[in-house]
């Protein structure tokens, strides 16, 4: 015990303040766990403030480290910016920095391969499968355009359209109208291009399959038609989603008002345009125009689908006819075999080990053979004629046409009988009885 009492005196002086700090931290933890609080109160306020400062520093360092870790793993967007004059700038931004600059939330920049048009904090967010865009009153941002083959449209066509030099209907309107029309026009042209590629391929394949010169169906053509049918189904789904997304906007008047971004930032835009139409109505007309274009594409795709279904029915009919021919041939051969077997019993009778005087005559062999073949032929012909009568299509009954004058006379008699009053007939019978 005396050695333990002398141990603090043997420790270096530099270790004593550290030991005091450790003791204070241990007592703080005991007080938090429900231990004695009296020794903690008896400690000096200097030790408690030192422990509190150490905890704050540790907490701040942990939060800074977590933020640095999240920033290091954040998604980086390749952004292309288009302003009102058509100037183009490209840069890279992390997802956290980008939604802070645009006053958006993280879920607003979570782009899935779906078609949607939404508004948030005076911003328009457009998702068109692989095309991701954010529209503000001053600029248009295209995100992650790399590896999408969009360079020609982005850097040659889109700047002139946004600057009002292209063939856009909304060039005298605010910037967001031109941006929305340019994106919708690009998507409609993309869908139309896919349809124009599929249409000649499908028609060529159908012509080859339905050609009456070919008695059999080429399986390679059927495989090509199956692949084109799948592509057509995907195109129909994309067109349907595009129509539904635009129809949702047309059904909500508040959404149409929110799409007019400049209306909320510039008070002069509240006035009606030169044509006397409000900007919300012009947005509605714009969306209705592209909805009609999508409807036309849907009708063309539906016509192709109807052609495929009709050709499929024709192919099935041809296959059924070939199958019927094969079944008829099989039935004819079966009848011939039955006829030969029936008259072959005569040969079986002569083939038995029985003696008769007919075996000695050579003419009997040829006579019996001739009778067998003639009888088999006659029976086969009778069976074939019976089969032909059964397979013939029934003749529809002949309707005898009555003369026109007879029909008119009968009709007049019916009209007279229907117009004759019942009371008059009753009175005549009473008078006749009197």
UniProtKB/Swiss-Prot annotation:
Parts of the chain that traverse the membrane: 331-350, 362-392
Source domain of life: Eukaryota
Membrane topology (UniProt): Multi-pass membrane protein
Transit peptide residue numbers: 1-53
This protein's record includes keyword Ion transport: yes
GO biological process: lactate metabolic process; mitochondrial magnesium ion transmembrane transport
Subcellular location, record wording: Mitochondrion inner membrane
Regions of this protein lying in the Mitochondrial matrix compartment: 54-330, 393-434
Major site of localization recorded for this protein: mitochondrion
GO terms under cellular component: mitochondrial inner membrane; mitochondrion
This protein's record includes keyword Transmembrane helix: yes
Motif (GMN motif): 351-353
Mitochondrial intermembrane face residues: 351-361
Alphabetical list of Gene3D superfamilies matching this protein: 2.40.128.330, Magnesium transport protein CorA, transmembrane region
Expression (tissue specificity): Ubiquitously expressed.
Keywords: Ion transport, Magnesium, Membrane, Metal-binding, Mitochondrion, Mitochondrion inner membrane, Transit peptide, Transmembrane, Transmembrane helix, Transport
Residues noted as binding Mg(2+) 3 in the record, renumbered to the chain: 351, 353
Regulation: May be regulated by calcium ions.
Entry-linked Pfam families: MRS2-like (PF22099)
Molecular-function GO term, any one: magnesium ion transmembrane transporter activity
List of residues binding Mg(2+) 1: 234, 237-238, 303
Record remark: domains: The GMN motif acts as an ion selectivity filter.
Family in the record: Belongs to the CorA metal ion transporter (MIT) (TC 1.A.35) family.
Complexes and interactors: Homopentamer.
Job description of the protein: Magnesium transporter that mediates the influx of magnesium into the mitochondrial matrix and regulates magnesium metabolism. Also permeable to calcium, sodium and potassium ions. Required for normal expression of the mitochondrial respiratory complex I subunits. May play a role in maintaining the inner mitochondrial membrane potential.
Protein name in UniProt: Magnesium transporter MRS2 homolog, mitochondrial
């Amino acid at each position: 015990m005396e050695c333990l009492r002398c141990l603090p005196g043997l420790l270096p002086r530099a270790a004593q303040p550290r030991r005091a700090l450790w003791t204070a931290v241990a007592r703080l933890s005991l007080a938090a766990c429900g231990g004695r609080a009296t020794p903690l109160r008896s400690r000096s306020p200097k030790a408690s403030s030192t422990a509190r400062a150490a905890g704050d520093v540790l907490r701040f360092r942990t939060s800074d480290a977590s933020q640095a870790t999240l920033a290091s793993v954040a998604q980086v967007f390749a952004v292309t910016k288009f302003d009102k004059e058509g100037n183009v700038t490209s840069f890279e931004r992390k997802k956290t920095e980008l939604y802070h600059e645009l006053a958006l939330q993280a879920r607003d920049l979570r782009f899935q391969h779906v078609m949607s048009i939404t508004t948030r904090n005076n911003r328009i967010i457009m998702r068109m499968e692989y095309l991701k865009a954010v529209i503000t009153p001053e600029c248009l941002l295209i995100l992650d355009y790399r590896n999408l083959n969009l360079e020609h449209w982005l850097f040659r066509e889109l700047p002139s359209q946004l600057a009002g030099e292209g063939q856009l209907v909304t060039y005298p309107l605010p910037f967001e109208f031109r941006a929305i029309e340019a994106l919708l026009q690009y998507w409609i042209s993309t869908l139309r291009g896919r349809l124009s590629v599929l249409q000649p391929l499908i028609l060529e394949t159908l012509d080859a399959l339905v050609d009456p010169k070919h008695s059999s169906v080429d399986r390679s053509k059927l495989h090509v038609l199956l692949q084109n049918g799948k592509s057509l189904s995907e195109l129909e789904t994309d067109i349907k989603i595009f129509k539904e997304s635009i129809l949702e906007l047309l059904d909500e008047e508040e959404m149409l008002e929110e799409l007019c971004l400049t209306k909320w930032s510039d008070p002069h835009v509240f006035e009606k345009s030169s044509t006397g139409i409000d900007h919300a109505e012009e947005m509605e007309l714009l969306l209705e125009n592209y909805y009609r274009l999508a409807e036309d594409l849907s009708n063309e795709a539906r016509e192709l689908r109807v052609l495929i279904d009709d050709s499929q029915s024709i192919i099935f009919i041809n296959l059924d006819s070939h199958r019927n021919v094969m079944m008829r041939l099989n039935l004819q051969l079966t009848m011939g075999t039955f006829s030969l077997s029936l008259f072959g019993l005569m040969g079986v009778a002569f083939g038995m080990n029985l003696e008769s005087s007919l075996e000695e005559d050579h003419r009997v062999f040829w006579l019996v053979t001739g009778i067998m073949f003639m009888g088999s032929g006659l029976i086969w012909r009778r069976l074939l004629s019976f089969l032909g009568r059964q397979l013939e299509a029934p003749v529809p009954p002949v309707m005898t046409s009555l003369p026109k004058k007879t029909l008119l006379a009968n009709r007049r008699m019916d009209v007279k009988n229907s117009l004759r009053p019942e009371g008059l007939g009753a009175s005549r019978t009473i008078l006749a009885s009197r």
